[in-house]
Amino acid sequence: MSGDNTGNKSNSAPSKSIEELLKLLAMGQELSPAQQKEMKDYKFWKTQPVPSLSETVTEEGPIDKLKTPEDVPNDPLPLISDFEWSTLDIDDNLQLDELYKLLYDNYVEDIDATFRFKYSHEFFQWALKPPGWRKDWHVGVRVKSTGKLVAFIAATPVTFKLNKSNKVIDSVEINFLCIHKKLRNKRLAPVLIKEITRRVNKQNIWQALYTGGSILPTPLTTCRYQHRPINWSKLHDVGFSHLPPNQTKSSMVASYTLPNNPKLKGLRPMTGKDVSTVLSLLYKYQERFDIVQLFTEEEFKHWMLGHDENSDSNVVKSYVVEDENGVITDYFSYYLLPFTVLDNAQHDELGIAYLFYYASDSFEKPNYKKRLNELITDALITSKKFGVDVFNCLTCQDNTYFLKDCKFGSGDGFLNYYLFNYRTFPMDGGIDKKTKEVVEDQTSGIGVVLL
């Protein structure tokens, strides 16, 4: 899970170990030059099938020599004597509670220890159990003597397509790499990465998608985090937003106030009956991007409507727009992952929404930008009833078309997209490569949205 370093926090955390650098990588956080050099020079990454930072890609394709699952060892990698591998059963609420505690105490946290992700059982079920999921891809490490869970890494199946070369590749998304704070000197991170790679390779999958800060060879592109305040007053109370010069709290609240009801005629929640139609709309729309995710209808239903088809999801929200003839012309989705707020007398939780996938049939029409702004404005409005205080997105997809008019602001965090064991040509990330500022009204190359 990659997240922006919220607020205007310092990016100069001390460099101590490879595990801490990987932790910062998971935060999508900019590192100091010394940290970047340490990561770049670390021997582990030189052994991995990733492009070097200095090479120019002349041809797309796998980096490693062709292998088969029979070439992959059957046994897990050895761990130091005090620890043992543990495959987590996320259908077991007790083990989910263990994972929650590990992540809550040790996962992504801003440097000032102000915010932590507040995961729910439902979120874990949604994020870790899409169609095609495998139990042995939920990899834990426990202390032998006590059974305590002290590390975790996960993989979930993802099929992606490179539109320019028309190549379709089975892969996984790597997520939730987490190591207990007291074990950062045990060099568990490289072992976890190698072990999840081994398990994925045994299923004849040789590529992986992942995201992180600008410290690894070699990103497809860099995107920048964007934030749209929904409840500015609360964001100010917890230190997420600051009062600009020559502004009052009242003026800031008024600036970000949204209507109570959506504006688009024909907007309604997406249902299971819409899956096939919306997926077709998305595929046509996403032809404009360089890299996209392909879904079966079963996968798309899971990601858009949630893990339990018999109840409304508390994690992901999807809406469609129907015209007067009942034809679906647009759709949007976002997922909810709140923060726990630490050491604040007024608030203990911050509602966070993350823009997910969207599509419109107006992408070739003159009114496309206007339509996209209307669509995302309604996404912001609908999020209010779910307790959202800030709505986040990246500069991927066509997001730069609506950021200014919808009053998003650039955050401090940057997120790189990476492909493991595959070379591709560089892609546009919606920002200027030198200044890192948003390039308005420019289609990015990234049509994949990872958790």
Curated annotation (Swiss-Prot):
GO cellular component: cytosol
Enzyme Commission identifier(s): 2.3.1.97
SUPFAM superfamilies to which the protein is assigned, alphabetical: Acyl-CoA N-acyltransferases (Nat) (SSF55729)
Main localization of the protein described in the UniProt heading: cytoplasm
Record localization: Cytoplasm
GO MF annotations in UniProt: glycylpeptide N-tetradecanoyltransferase activity
Activity control summary: Competitively inhibited by SC-58272, a peptidomimetic derived from the N-terminal sequence of a natural substrate.
Binding site for tetradecanoyl-CoA: 177-179, 185-189
Catalytic activity reported: N-terminal glycyl-[protein] + tetradecanoyl-CoA = N-tetradecanoylglycyl-[protein] + CoA + H(+)
Active-site residues, Swiss-Prot/TrEMBL: 451 (proton acceptor)
InterPro entries: Acyl_CoA_acyltransferase, NMT, NMT_C, NMT_CS, NMT_N
Cystine pairs: none
Known function: Adds a myristoyl group to the N-terminal glycine residue of certain cellular proteins. Substrate specificity requires an N-terminal glycine in the nascent polypeptide substrates. Ser is present at position 5 in almost all known N-myristoyl proteins and Lys is commonly encountered at postion 6. Basic residues are preferred at positions 7 and 8.
Remaining remarks: Has an ordered Bi-Bi kinetic mechanism, with myristoyl-CoA binding taking place prior to peptide binding and CoA release occurring before acylated peptide release. Cooperative interactions between the acyl-CoA and peptide binding sites of NMT contribute to its extraordinary chain-length specificity.
Subunit and partners: Monomer.
Family membership noted in the UniProt record: Belongs to the NMT family.
Official protein name in the record: Glycylpeptide N-tetradecanoyltransferase
Organism: Candida albicans (strain SC5314 / ATCC MYA-2876) (Yeast)
